[in-house]
């Protein structure tokens, strides 16, 4: 371990000294911006949403595009709910250049775009009574995101815009939250015109990568390793490494591979000039309990509520000795789904099972070359995915 540390220090020293190993490219200005600053850079506002259990979520809005900025009339509303567990925040919808980011593309197409954040990530770390230093603050998983965060966000957006319905777009865990919420709360589903599921993760039976390996460890060991509070929060060290190391020509690929190790490899489809922007905004953090919940999905081979570890604790939370199962077969909402053939998390075999369980599936497309991150950062995402999303929204308008 000491030898590894010395090697890392040696490499970093060479890079910072501007030695013979290569050159340092200019830092992208957006690498030093948070999501609010990125959006405000384009002239758009931020909102705060309070959930029923007291969490305060940051929601970002792009009310108009570049071509329709003087159009003040009502527009169809889109809610982008990225929430991939412990890696991302709303910035991921806008961290590519404007003509390659779904948030900006939808705004330019005439939609009122809202982008949400989960409790516990960089932009949703406030609570009415709790502090992030308290264990109680971090006692949540995607159960609470589906039960509280998504309904609060949708209701706030509809109230603010005066609309009766909106389009909901989710990626990864954002889809998990949507499927749970819309199947458990039919009244909430009625407020959504159509659900767009990008690389949905509802089971990990055929998945591969680090998450599957973590899933083999006992819950108590995971808590011993990571504590009981936050997991992979955004940090000053990560930002420093992103802006000082990931801008170096020979290090960009290494920084990009950090993401690929989790989600699958497709290096040719990533904008390498934006790696420092990606890495300064990811990871954005979540709770250890949320991470443990996902490892339970791996262990038990089914999507169910969080297992509190004993019959007594489960009975206290659920009035039964075991966690209740989630069934999406009850969801009555037009749904379009896209999947990737090289996605390590939303594996094709898991997706094929999911497709048989969606009662109102109206569209599905598999993109054979794509991994989990191509849906948000892929260079070819506009013409292979985003244009189809816009077309379907206008069709179901």
Swiss-Prot record:
Catalytic activity: a sterol ester + H2O = a sterol + a fatty acid + H(+); cholesteryl (9Z-octadecenoate) + H2O = cholesterol + (9Z)-octadecenoate + H(+); a triacylglycerol + H2O = a 1,2-diacylglycerol + a fatty acid + H(+); 1,2-di-(9Z-octadecenoyl)-glycerol + (9Z)-octadecenoate + H(+) = 1,2,3-tri-(9Z-octadecenoyl)-glycerol + H2O
Cytoplasm in keyword set: no
Keyword Transmembrane helix annotated: no
UniProt name for this protein: Lysosomal acid lipase/cholesteryl ester hydrolase
Protein origin, superkingdom: Eukaryota
Record's function text: Catalyzes the deacylation of cholesteryl ester core lipids of endocytosed low density lipoproteins to generate free fatty acids and cholesterol. Hydrolyzes triglycerides (1,2,3-triacylglycerol) and diglycerides (such as 1,2-diacylglycerol and 1,3-diacylglycerol) with preference for the acyl moieties at the sn-1 or sn-3 positions.
Signal peptide interval: 1-25
Family statement drawn from the similarity comment of this UniProt entry: Belongs to the AB hydrolase superfamily. Lipase family.
């Amino acid at each position: 371990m000491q030898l590894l540390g010395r090697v890392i220090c040696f490499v970093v020293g060479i890079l910072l000294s501007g030695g013979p190993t290569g050159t340092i490219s200019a830092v992208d200005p957006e690498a030093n911006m948070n999501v609010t600053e990125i959006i405000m850079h384009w002239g758009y506002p931020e909102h705060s949403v309070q959930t029923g259990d007291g969490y305060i979520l940051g929601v970002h809005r792009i009310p108009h595009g570049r071509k329709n900025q003087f159009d003040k009339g009502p527009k169809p509303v889109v809610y982008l709910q990225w929430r991939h567990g412990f890696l991302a925040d709303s910035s991921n919808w806008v961290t590519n250049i404007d003509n390659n980011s779904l948030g900006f593309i939808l705004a330019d197409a005439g939609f009122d775009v809202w982008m949400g954040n989960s409790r516990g990530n960089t932009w949703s770390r406030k609570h009415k009574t709790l502090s992030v230093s308290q264990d109680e603050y971090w006692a949540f998983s995607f159960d609470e995101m589906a039960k509280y965060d998504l309904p609060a966000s949708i209701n706030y957006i509809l109230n603010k815009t005066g609309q009766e319905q909106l389009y909901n777009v989710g990626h990864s865990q954002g889809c998990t939250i949507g499927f749970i919420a819309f199947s458990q709360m039919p009244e909430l589903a009625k407020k959504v015109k159509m659900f767009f599921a990008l690389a949905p993760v509802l089971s990990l039976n055929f998945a591969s990568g680090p998450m599957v390996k973590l899933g083999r460890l006992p819950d108590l060991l995971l808590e011993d390793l990571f504590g009981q509070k936050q997991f992979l929060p955004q940090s000053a060290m990560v930002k420093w490494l992103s802006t000082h190391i990931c801008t170096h020509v020979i290090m960009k690929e290494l920084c990009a591979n950090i993401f690929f190790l989790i989600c699958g490899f497709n290096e040719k489809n990533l904008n390498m000039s934006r790696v420092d922007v990606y890495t300064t905004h990811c990871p954005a953090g979540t709770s250890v309990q949320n991470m443990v919940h996902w490892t339970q999905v791996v262990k038990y081979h089914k999507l169910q509520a969080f297992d509190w570890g004993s019959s007594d604790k489960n009975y206290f939370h659920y009035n039964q000795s075991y966690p209740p199962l989630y069934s999406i077969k009850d969801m009555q909402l037009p749904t379009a789904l896209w999947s990737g053939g090289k996605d390590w998390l939303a594996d094709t075999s898991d997706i094929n099972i999911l497709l048989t369980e969606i009662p109102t599936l109206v569209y599905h497309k598999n993109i054979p070359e794509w991994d989990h991150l191509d849906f948000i950062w892929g260079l070819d995402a506009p013409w292979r995915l985003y244009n189809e999303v816009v077309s379907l929204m206008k069709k179901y308008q």
